[in-house]
Amino acid sequence: MNPPFDSASFLKTVTHQPGVYRMYNADAVVIYVGKAKDLQKRLSSYFRKKVDSEKTRALVSNIAKIDVTVTHTETEALILEHNYIKQYLPKYNVLLRDDKSYPYILISGHKHPRLSMHRGAKKRKGEYFGPYPDSGAVRETLHLLQKIFPVRQCEDTVYSNRTRPCLMYQIGRCAGPCVSSIISDEEYAELVGFVRLFLQGKDQQVLKQLIEKMEVASQQLRFEDAAKFRDQIQAIRRVQEQQYVSEDSMDDMDVLGFAQENGIACIHILMIRQGKVLGSRSHFPKIPQNTSQQEVFDSFLTQYYLSHNEARTIPSRIILNQELADDLEPIQKALSEVAGRKVHFHTSPTGARGRYLKLSNTNALTAITTKINHKMTINQRFKALRETLGMESIMRMECFDISHTMGESTIASCVVFNNEGPVKQEYRRYNITGITGGDDYAAMGQALERRYSKQLDVEKIPDIIFIDGGKGQLNRAHEIIAQYWGDWPKRPIMIGIAKGVTRKPGLETLITVDGEEFNLPSDAPALHLIQHIRDESHNHAIAGHRAKRGKTRRTSALEGIEGVGPKRRQALLKYMGGLQELKRASVEEIAKVPGISHSLAEIIFQALKQ
């Protein structure tokens, strides 16, 4: 047994300067990371005789060692604390689980700019607008812009190899800058300028210019042009009716609503950019028991904004609840430093800002209610499945499925559920190779070999393994897994899910490795859980298969041609703008591709015609 932590001796060595501390347990695992303006004062508070917080008492009872890092300023300590939390994911810290990047709309720096969605680092030349709360909001905006201002959205490789306009031009969704006779550079630049103003929220400026153009065109008897401008004006006005525009300034704002109930905390962020509400997103940080609202919110603020190190993701203004604004100066300084400009916090908003905050708080509470109801449904389904199978507990389930088209591009999927539902970060796909096309038994065997042949952590061993298939698939799966579970502390139950004759949901037959077959009522919660994990596995496999099949079909026609390796294949597809364009090309056109001789062009031409 390890001796108790000697806090008295330790505290004698601690400075009064700002810094970060890391607390370790007996296994040398970091269990908590904190920051302090005065390290001595903050660390002493953990070891007082009377500590009210249950969480703090539990934390202190597990401390075996504390490391301290002194910093120059409190702001520096805040940033270092965030980096340590991200590195160690300590048990007693509030952890923000949603660390996805936010999408932007990009107007590229091309001569004829392209409009597209962008995620990740902003390395490409061009102008970025956003962030948007999700890809759906970006796609909706791009679709809308395509109808009002038909700026091209095709890839540069496709654009550069076109000699005539594509279908998007024919249906009025692209101005056709790839063909110089259709639209001049000046006209296209004007179109891009309208898009830029629209994305900046300057709708009135766009309307004013379009109205002027419509009137001029009408006076000059260019009625077709006047009608086009009229349609654009009407479309923008319809958008304005649907999109609430803030009366507030044109500053970017995030409005942070907060709610915490039944051990669940939610921060609902309403994103406002250039006066327009782009959308919102709810975040549910992982919180230890008995964590105060203030600690949850402070931890979220730091992790959320410092995780997105691109300055444009930090708005000029952040609106939040007064009761959660304990000590904002360090985080305000840190965010201003990262953003390279002043970031303002507003804690007692009135007018439009106050209404936004009230709306965000309501949405946060609604999101918690929805999550609790969903959790109750999942819990009920797990309980029903436990009772159906006579199991004491179910902590983890995995399900496998195979997808292919007539044996082509076979993909296996594995999805994972715990008692909160799908664990999507643990979903896996397996690219199946070296088997006879269409041999599902061999495909399943290969996937299971790759999944279970390596050493598994105890918590990663499933309680149930579902196989989407009948007796044959299940028996093959059992043969494979039985080779590896000898050293496992528990053996999973294996169940096959066979579709009914009509393949309708609710008519599934469940099969055990003993050969027992049984059905559940179509309204049984246990069956709904099985259908859920089966459908997740099926969809995950199909998505992977379609992507692989598409890639194979784009390149396979070139792979068998002697003298055409990966570099030449890439050059051909890039120069021509795709496989279909290459198939339509003449020998002379193919010979223009860098690195392709006339004789090789003839070989390629003949091979593609077969």
Curated annotation (Swiss-Prot):
SMART domains recorded: GIYc, HhH1
Family as reported in the entry's similarity comment: Belongs to the UvrC family.
Report if keyword Acetylation is assigned: no
One GO MF term: excinuclease ABC activity
- Organism placement in taxonomy: Bacteria, Pseudomonadati, Pseudomonadota, Gammaproteobacteria, Vibrionales
Q: Name one GO cellular component term.
A: cytoplasm
One Gene Ontology term from the biological process aspect of the record: SOS response
Q: Which Pfam families match?
A: GIY-YIG, HHH_5, UVR, UvrC_RNaseH, UvrC_RNaseH_dom
Primary location class: cytoplasm
Physiological role = The UvrABC repair system catalyzes the recognition and processing of DNA lesions. UvrC both incises the 5' and 3' sides of the lesion. The N-terminal half is responsible for the 3' incision and the C-terminal half is responsible for the 5' incision.
Keywords recorded for this protein, A-Z: Cytoplasm, DNA damage, DNA excision, DNA repair, Excision nuclease, SOS response
Residues of the UVR domain: 204-239
Instruction: Name the source organism.
Output: Vibrio parahaemolyticus serotype O3:K6 (strain RIMD 2210633)
Subunit structure, briefly? Interacts with UvrB in an incision complex.
Q: Fetch the PROSITE patterns from UniProt.
A: GIY_YIG, UVR, UVRC
PANTHER family reported in the protein's UniProt record: UVRABC SYSTEM PROTEIN C (PTHR30562:SF1), UVRC/OXIDOREDUCTASE (PTHR30562)
UniProt protein name: UvrABC system protein C
Q: Where is the GIY-YIG domain?
A: 16-94
Its annotated compartments are: Cytoplasm
